[in-house]
Amino acid sequence: MEYQRGDIVLVDLEPVRGSEQGRTRPCIIIQNDIANRFSPVTKIIPVTDAHNVKKSYPCLVYLSQTKDEMAKDSVAQCNQIRTIDAENRIIKRIGRIREQKMKEIDQALRIHLALM
């Protein structure tokens, strides 16, 4: 299956090591569409329940249950960029991030990666 930048996908992130985000969870594809078309791997950021986040950081983007197609209020963790094998780790596509919210994610990625 071909995925696009901004797709929300359910991903099996196990096994992990140390402080890496784990379990099966929603993730957002951040890799460009050309690379997604031709590469077996893709770049994702994991999403976690907003109630699990104790502090606000510039690398976190809040996602609304009602506006952003999430099962509950959540946080995109732009500080946890992962490269995954799309065929073996992605279970299914579950939604798509709004363009405005993707711009916020892009900004958080720029801050996290010092690309500003």
Spans of model-derived segments:
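Conserved functional hotspots at enzyme active or ligand-binding sites that engage polyanionic ligands
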Residues: 1-116
